[in-house]
């Protein structure tokens, strides 16, 4: 590798990873609530360990959800259906500890500071303040057709394929837990030129040999996913490098909602504000504003206004308007960053109520995001992945 080139690595995990089990359970409960109560306030946390699921958090809703039933159905869909896998949907214990949302928080969310002070009319604002303070990032680049960085895009596709070959009985000896990792080499112009390394670790039946796993995964997982032109004789493969991965899932490691925030976003390629997504309704700006920031960044790149774009939004609890908007195009912008911020303010309503309305976020759409990434998805229709504002942004920014 020449001195002007660099390597960058991102990872993903399968739906059977302990932390991802928790994300999916939390979002399954959220979706079940939103089906009958779109205005519910939900902050649902899940933890799993050997034979045990604990669901806790704050939920304010007018509907009823059978949480243990939802938990078991989710675990079953993932594939933990037999005790010998280390976790079983039918026999695991499910404990719940749910409270209502704090009245102090609800006061700020129900009526934004601007509405309480009379500085914005009822016609201007839906009177929803941010559910917490915080900063959120969104990112897009033109490395892939999904406008995502290549390392995380390939890592997700490998993880999804790992699950597909298990569920479709192509490789029936695989079990639900697994991880993937891709290292991409970039040239002096910051363009991806080759894959330097691929790492896959997958849980498996105890009687299968490492050689068979390595041969099968290369044929059925790596080759169908990774573009042939990015592979060369120096590409390194690490498939189950420990040699054995029989004990997995919650039996191998405890899991917790919100512990895979880099997998959920951009694989470390862009910055992260620290807030997790799963189990939170759209009044929580950790989730909704991160989706809005991706929506903004993707439309800027889709408009041809930048090759790479990172958007930061920041909020104060109980205040509707973002306290700051920042845009970084990494010297690839066709317009100044000040101009882009002006154009974004004119075309996107980034108040919590505005985001909810703009992206139609009071729907049960969240479980499908809880594994294989919240961004760059081609298999599901997610509103923040649309590029419907690209033309308007380009015309206003460039004066066309």
Curated annotation (Swiss-Prot):
Pathway: Amino-acid biosynthesis; S-adenosyl-L-methionine biosynthesis; S-adenosyl-L-methionine from L-methionine: step 1/1. K(+) binds at residue 45. One of its GO terms (cellular component) is cytoplasm. L-methionine binds at residues 58, 101, 253, 284. It holds the Pfam family S-AdoMet_synt_N. Its cofactor is Mg(2+); K(+). Its EC number is 2.5.1.6. The keyword Transmembrane does not apply. Belongs to the AdoMet synthase family. This is S-adenosylmethionine synthase. It comes from Bacillus velezensis (strain DSM 23117 / BGSC 10A6 / LMG 26770 / FZB42). The gene is metK.
């Amino acid at each position: 590798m020449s001195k002007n080139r660099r390597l960058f690595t991102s990872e993903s995990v399968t739906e059977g990873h302990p932390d991802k089990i928790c994300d999916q359970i939390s979002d399954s409960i959220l979706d079940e609530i939103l089906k009958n109560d779109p205005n519910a306030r939900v902050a649902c946390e899940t933890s799993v360990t050997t034979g045990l699921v604990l669901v806790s958090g704050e939920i304010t809703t007018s509907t009823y959800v059978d949480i243990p039933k939802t938990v078991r159905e989710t675990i079953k869909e993932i594939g933990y259906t037999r005790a010998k896998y280390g976790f079983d949907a039918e026999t695991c214990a499910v404990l719940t500890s749910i409270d209502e949302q704090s009245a102090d928080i609800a006061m700020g969310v129900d009526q934004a500071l601007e509405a309480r002070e009379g500085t914005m009319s009822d016609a201007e604002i839906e009177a929803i303040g941010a559910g917490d303070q915080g900063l959120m990032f969104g990112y897009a680049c033109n490395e892939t057709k999904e406008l995502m960085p290549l390392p995380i895009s390939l890592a997700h596709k490998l993880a999804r394929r790992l699950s597909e070959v298990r569920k479709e009985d192509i490789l029936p000896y695989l079990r639900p837990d697994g991880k993937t990792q891709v290292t991409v080499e970039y040239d002096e112009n910051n363009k991806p030129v080759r894959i330097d390394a691929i790492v896959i670790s997958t849980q498996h039946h105890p009687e299968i040999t490492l050689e068979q796993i390595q041969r099968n995964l290369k044929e059925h997982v790596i080759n169908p996913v990774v573009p042939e032109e990015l592979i060369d004789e120096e590409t390194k493969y690490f498939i189950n490098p420990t040699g054995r991965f029989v004990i997995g899932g919650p039996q191998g490691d405890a899991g917790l909602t919100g512990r895979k925030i880099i997998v959920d976003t951009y694989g470390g390629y862009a910055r992260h504000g620290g807030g997790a997504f799963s189990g939170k309704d759209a009044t929580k700006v950790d989730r909704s504003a991160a989706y809005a920031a991706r929506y903004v960044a993707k439309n800027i790149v889709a408009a041809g206004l930048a090759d790479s774009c990172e958007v930061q939004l920041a909020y104060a609890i109980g205040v509707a308007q973002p306290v700051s908007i920042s845009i970084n195009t990494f010297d690839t912008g066709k317009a100044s960053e000040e101009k882009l911020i002006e154009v974004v303010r004119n075309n996107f309503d980034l108040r919590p109520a505005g985001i909810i309305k703009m992206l139609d976020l009071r729907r049960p759409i969240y479980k499908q995001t809880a594994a294989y990434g919240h961004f760059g998805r081609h298999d599901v229709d997610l509103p923040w992945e649309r590029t419907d504002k690209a033309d308007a942004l380009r015309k206003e920014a460039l004066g066309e």
